[in-house]
């Protein structure tokens, strides 16, 4: 169960870090936005290593679904933009795919 906590915290810090770069480079904010960006992205990487998984690629693939959920949440809450129907459909498809990766049977180690 702690995996979900690590995934959601990692997503929060990854999105926050990328958003800080977005604010600096796309919105013309101060270069000081780079400081929280780098701190957030470092925390993202560290948190993702706490996930209990045998293979990094499988952990990252499962994380992708949670990242998309968090991104649509960020869009709605932080940027105050109402997600479109296509956003919700894409989110659902990605969560289904990530669930197959996360909960699917393991027939081999490869």
From Swiss-Prot:
Keywords, in A-Z order: Cell inner membrane, Cell membrane, Membrane, Transmembrane, Transmembrane helix
Annotated compartments: Cell inner membrane
Gene Ontology CC annotation, any one: plasma membrane
Domain of life: Bacteria
Topology in the lipid bilayer: Multi-pass membrane protein
Transmembrane intervals: 5-25, 31-51, 59-79, 84-104
Keyword Methyltransferase: no
Entries under InterPro entries matching the protein: UPF0060
Entry-linked Pfam families: UPF0060
Predominant localisation class: membrane
UniProt xrefs under HAMAP family: UPF0060
Similarity section: Belongs to the UPF0060 family.
Stated name of the protein: UPF0060 membrane protein PFL_4337
Protein species of origin: Pseudomonas fluorescens (strain ATCC BAA-477 / NRRL B-23932 / Pf-5)
């Amino acid at each position: 169960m702690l995996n979900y906590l690590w995934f959601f915290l990692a997503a929060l810090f990854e999105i926050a870090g990328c958003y800080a770069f977005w604010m600096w480079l796309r919105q013309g904010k101060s270069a000081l936005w780079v400081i929280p960006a780098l701190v957030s992205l470092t925390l993202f990487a560290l948190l993702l290593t706490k996930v209990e998984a045998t293979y990094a690629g499988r952990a990252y693939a499962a994380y992708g679904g949670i990242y998309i959920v968090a991104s649509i949440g960020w869009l709605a809450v932080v940027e105050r933009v109402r997600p479109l129907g296509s956003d919700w459909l894409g989110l659902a498809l990605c969560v289904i795919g990530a669930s197959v990766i996360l909960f699917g049977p393991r027939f081999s180690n490869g």
